[in-house]
A protein has these predicted regions:
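Protease zymogen maturation seam
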Residues: 1-11, 17-29, 34-37, 255, ...
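Active-site core segment of subtilase-fold serine proteases
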Residues: 1-92, 96-112, 118-119, 172, ...
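Solvent-exposed, polar/charged alpha-helical surfaces in well-ordered, non-transmembrane soluble domains
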Residues: 24, 50-54, 95, 99-106, ...
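Hydrolase catalytic cores
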Residues: 53-57, 76-83, 110-114, 140, ...
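Sec-exported extracytoplasmic/periplasmic mature domains
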Residues: 57-61, 71, 102-110, 117, ...
Length: 310
């Protein structure tokens, strides 16, 4: 949710359990929300949010830990609770999720990262309406594709024109076996063995589409930092048009996919931060050829009905 002109002032949001607010590598925005209680500030329910936040915006060049995709971005933490035997907290309702998305859109968010999904193929109109509302307010709504290795579930699949759905690939450039796929998938990003921040103030290695989605949210932040006046559609087109075709997949023409050749397992392909920002900033030096291996590309599902982390 970039806001203004410089990366240090970009506002970014992630939806899920909220973020540990004392981590030296993270910058939190001074607005937060607890969708479970309907109050402010957000609450810390588990470690998932902190892990996602690090991928988006952990500080670079500070001699600590890792660097996020959009270093210095400010995170608007929004808590969404889930059923957990250890925490003993009841799951949030669909209304809580919808309210969280609307809160973000109404309080300056421009990128809404959603690293969660419901284990259902039935549309959830309340949440889909909130997604459409946020899109209409000028937000890019990013969703992880899910970790069941099956078709993308709700609500990511429920509002295709208003969401950017992200699957995961491994270090060799192939679709991760757990990554959701199908007609709703837009792009892929690294999602296996990703180093990020944790609630101890340290760092941890994680896998899942939850950690692919924030790569894309970070790139969106970089694009809007370069030109904050770009429309939602222009930003989305840049993300999809600057991808790399990877993993030995066969790409084809889909009449509903207007930004190039597409594949049901990896979408338009692997997001490319360098090419995306270059598409905004103008001609740039030719990027080095890194081949098909991602070994050189270091970073940079909750289940109500089975609300699950991705």
């Amino acid at each position: 949710m970039p806001l203004l002109f410089h990366i240090s002032t970009i506002l970014s949001l992630r939806l899920s359990i909220t973020v540990f607010n004392n981590h030296d590598d993270l910058h939190l925005y001074n607005v937060s929300y607890n969708a479970h209680t309907g109050g402010i500030p957000s609450g810390l329910y588990g470690d998932h949010g902190t892990k996602v936040a690090g991928v988006i915006g952990a500080t670079a060049n500070n001699g600590k830990g890792i660097a996020g995709v959009a270093s210095g971005v400010k995170i608007m933490p929004i808590s969404i609770c889930y059923t957990d035997n250890e925490l003993g907290i009841a799951a949030s309702t669909t209304t809580n999720f919808a309210n969280a998305i609307r809160f973000a859109a109404n309080n300056g968010a421009r990128v809404i990262n959603n690293s969660w999904s419901f284990d259902t193929s039935s549309p959830i109109s309340e949440i889909n309406n909130a997604i459409t509302y946020a899109h209409g307010k000028g937000c890019i709504v990013v969703f992880s594709s899910g970790n069941k290795g099956s078709a993308v579930s709700q609500p990511a699949a429920g509002a295709p024109s208003a969401t950017l759905v992200v699957g995961a690939i491994d270090r060799n450039g192939y679709k991760s076996d757990f990554s959701g796929y199908g007609s709703s998938l837009d792009v892929v990003a690294p999602g296996r063995e990703i180093w990020t921040t944790d609630v101890t103030g340290g760092y941890t290695c994680v896998s899942g589409t939850s950690f692919a989605a924030p790569h894309v949210s970070g790139i969106v932040a970089l694009i809007w930092a370069t030109d904050p006046d770009l429309s939602v559609w222009r930003v989305r087109n840049i993300i999809e048009q600057t991808t790399r075709k990877i993993g030995g997949n066969t790409y084809g023409v889909d009449p509903l996919r207007l930004n190039g050749l597409w594949n049901q397992f990896v979408g338009y392909g692997l997001v490319n931060a360098y090419a995306a920002v270059s598409a905004v900033s103008g001609p740039a030096p030719t990027a080095p050829n890194i081949g098909t291996s991602l070994s050189e590309v270091e970073p940079g599902d909750l289940s109500m009905m089975g609300l699950g982390y991705d």
